[in-house]
Amino acid sequence: MKKILLIILLLSLLPIARVALPQNDPWRHAQNQSCFAMNGSKVFHIPGELETTVQKRIEWMKELGVGWDRSDWWWHVMEPEKGRFDFSVPDKIVDYFEKQHIQIYPILSYGASWWKGRNAPLSDGDFEDFGKYVFETVKRYKNHFTYWSVWNEPNIVPFWTPEPNPDHYARLLKIAYTQAKKADPECKICAPVIAPLGAWDKNFTERLFQLGCMDYFDVFDYHYYRNNPPEDEVPAEIADIKALMLRYGKEKPIWISESGVSAPTKDKEKSYKDQAALVVRNQLLCLACGVKRFFYFDLQNWTDNPDDPWDSKLGLVEAGGEKKPSFLAYKTMVKEVDFKNVIGRFRRPDEGWDAVLLFDPKHSKYILAAWCNGLGSTKKVDFVCEPLDVKIVHPYGDVEIRTLNASPAPDQFTRSVSVEIDQNPRYIHSVDPFRYLPEAAVRLSPEKIYMNPGEKVGFRLETSPLVNLFEHAEAEIIGKTPPEGLVWDEKNGSLEASKDISPGTKTVSANVRVASLLKFDRRILEFKTSAIVEILPVMTIQLRPYMEENALKLQATVINQSPWYLKGALSLVEIRTAAPKILMKKDVGIVQPQATWREDLLLDKKIVTEYKTPFSWQLKFQDKESNPFRIYTAPFRDNAPVIDANLEEWKDVPALVINRKEQITRGPEGWTPSDVSGEVYFWFTPDAVNVAARVTDDDPMYNTQPPNFIWKGDALEVYLGFDGPAKRGVLNKKVDFQVGIAPDCEKKRPIVFLFHEDRIIEDAKVAAQKTPDGYVIEASIPLKEFGSPVLSSGSLLGLDAAINDLDKNDWAPAGNDPGYALMWNGTTRNWIDPSNWGMAVLGKEE
């Protein structure tokens, strides 16, 4: 008897194996059909609060109609010691969630419990250990989860530390995919789960594809956050992702596992209304562009404190539990859209409104979700509907019925229903399929293509959604306008680029006629559809100087985007005078078609420290060259200037010149230097960075923005990398800084603002004054604000500067910021990516 009791006791101490559940559970089947999902419970952060906080969040999710919850599935919890797995915490979570009929989307992450000071793998053993964790975890939960996310935002700190590296993530992804498929051949791997860097991180992703990662994921998962109207940016971004996948393989399903709209609590009345509109428009457009599942981030605010960062205010519910208008708008969207076919987009940009067409197979009717572009506008639109009573569902769920007062005549196929729309989508039921279906369903495919000169790709008019849903119609091309250098063979479904076509963006358009085949309804509809073709240069040359362990190095890259073999030598050229000087040469051998050659070369610091005036470098290969890399020579002095907006003391300081069209990073056509241009000067001392600028501006010192948005008005932006120029693609906030210097702002005074800490530098000195053709501005910023870096003559810094300009009467289309921005060396990614910055050399004056 004692032996039996002992055996029972020992068995009770063993980990409980996950019970295999039938894959045809009705609730699980329903969730697999749903496109709506949430970053909702945060259960792995608070596993001890299942019955309280987590349960409340699950109840909110159910009220919204959402049955998917994205959750961390932390390695260090499941393997607290190397080789010892403990699944007790996740087992409990799985049991609790499945009883609630909530499907978890788990994130395989982050570092091992025995790693110190980092959360990303570095050694061979680290990668192998991660693979073991993936295998054991997927094997245990294979009857519960089909989809697995490999990491979260590996392209930024703090999720990949000490520094993001696409080559390392590619290796990790391949190991994770292999081990997961070994544990469960039916599982689906989702990657690369990248964070947005302004727009989607194409550079990081393309590097993964170049390393063969297209074969190591089943779903393309990425993140985006935008607080501006999405009608232009979002569809273009999704088309670009599809085009890049096609370039390196085949198109795969797209998920967005994080996307949110912030609603600052300082101005609730406006921000809450805008959030309600943008949350819904974002998701509707993504679904119309082919996104299969969309996880909103976040269900609940982290905090309601007005002074906390933007990402703490993304919730549909306040931190205190009060539901925002966006909660009701999201709930209405789920009810109107889920389990219906999202056909596509019906655009009317010239009329100021947009829409997405849905088909309800259960009731065999069409629904149009329609709204005004931009924010704050209203418009009355006459919608063409079937001759029935028409239901209109308003943004927060209110239902209106427009009755048909009399029976329709035998030859009456439609009725017109006038609806006032605004920034919030409204759902008009029973719209006429012939009026809206052709434009929403018929499109050129692919909608975006990357091509080489001389290449032929598949290209056709996609009509199957129209034919499948509306069999009594046919579509034909009645006119097409491929640009010069492109030949569209409509019969064979191909598009071919000539060998001498110039690189750049081309638009291919087609005029389409759709005719109804019904004997009693012979309507004809004509419209235009288009696709974007990006002709790649034969090759791309990239130059990236950087500091590593106090050595100056250069990363040289040749990307062969052509179908031909390339051979030759790479030259580093110094551009200082009319006669460029070759500093070094490197034989790259043969670069195969669609391949990349990359090498890191050691440079002698003397080639940058012996000069007193600014200059630039370029890499040249065959007849192609890289963008210039600009190098500024800044004085390092013991004395500091007087900050009084008088630049007489600066007359012998070299100028960083910003006055060329190619330096524009934001703004409309028609720029001239008189609109905005200028010179920026830097003067370093042992305890301060001193900055001055002489700006040409036809409406000077106009800036009414709050401090964290001074870049939207007249202002300088300064970028400083105190560990030297960098090749990393993401800021290291300990050494990389973005500073705004504005002559005026919402506070009615000039300020210096540290963006990454979201604060005014009150210890900085700043002065500005107008001039006959613009303004001058001058500032001194203590080095202690940057962690007190030690500078000296010969120090090399990452450096860049931008001049931002806004005039009182400037205007831009919805979704765009008015005014201009000009950048000395970098790009629009400067705020997050220091690899685009130039370099400063500090020189002690004699």
PLM feature spans:
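Aromatic/acidic polysaccharide-binding cleft in carbohydrate-active enzymes
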Residues: 265-331, 344-353
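C-terminal beta-strand-rich structural cap/linker in extracellular carbohydrate-active enzymes
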Residues: 402-441
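N-terminal carbohydrate-binding accessory modules
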Residues: 21-67, 80-81, 95, 99-101, ...
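Intrinsically disordered, low-complexity Pro/Gly/Ser/Thr-rich segments with frequent PxxP/GP/PP motifs
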Residues: 484-503, 577-608
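Carbohydrate-binding surface patches
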Residues: 348-388
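Substrate-binding cleft and catalytic face of glycoside hydrolase catalytic domains
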Residues: 61-216, 224-227
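Noncatalytic carbohydrate-binding groove/subsite architecture in carbohydrate-active enzymes
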Residues: 166-283, 289-291
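Structural preference for beta-rich elements and adjacent junctions enriched in aromatics
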Residues: 543-553, 557-559, 595-846
